[in-house]
């Protein structure tokens, strides 16, 4: 069950950088100065997804009940705004290195904001990129994230919605230390130049190279930013219709696609088709994750999570921000069907 926090009087940290399409701010708890991230639902022209913050909270609760390492989200009130809140994943001596930094560090021609690069965002591109930073063993965590997304129907696992917690510490270098570092960098760049010249790529203005030049230490972060799921974009009328129309319900699930693509053409696949393809190469990992989900899945527990998720929401906010029983029923039905389809992959 999610807790409720009134963070109106907490200390806002406007100098912190936040990303994404939703209204966000960073605050610190005055009791212990711990850092939290607060965000509301998406609200812009043509897109008023009021239940979106609930999707974040529900997916977090369900994910953790099924054995996934998902960041905990709770309900929060910030002035006149209602949204979800999560505690910072990293300490002051750590930082979150987002996937986008790893992908662009691996391939300098990759431009995630350029539509022509969208098709490059594939499972194997991610695999190659993390391997280049000596993080190849973490591919299991990437697969876990993809399987988690299939359960909640998340369609927005973009490059900034996954990453690694890495050591971070500001250090002032002496002149001697700085000269030593720059000398090593100079030697490394010379090696790269020699490699390119030897392979006749240095004089090609469009040439680029992918090389393992760094070793990164760190761990895969908890799964975060998973609010684009659970039919959060559907109106109350559409929710009621989906509950009574099996064709519409099945079509909605079938249309759900992963943001992480597949193949040389970078095609977007249905969540379950993507997992089937990954399973061809990583059957032991995929089957292990799915079997663990099946062993932890308790239909009554999932229903209890969903139907009590807004129990701590104050009564004066319930009419405007509470979830209807119809929406809760649809969310439960979606989770139940998606887990069944996931189970069928390994049968």
Predicted regions and their residues:
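Hydrophobic residue at the +6 position relative to the catalytic HRD Asp in the kinase catalytic loop
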Residues: 162-167
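ATP-dependent phospho-/nucleotidyl transfer catalytic cores
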Residues: 89-146, 171-191, 204, 312
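C-terminal catalytic region of ATP-dependent kinase domains
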Residues: 169-347
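Conserved catalytic-loop position in the HRD/HxD motif
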Residues: 156, 161
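Conserved ATP-binding subdomain of kinase catalytic cores across diverse folds
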Residues: 1-110
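Aromatic-acidic/polar surface patches that form glycan- and anion
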Residues: 51-53, 135, 140-141, 324, ...
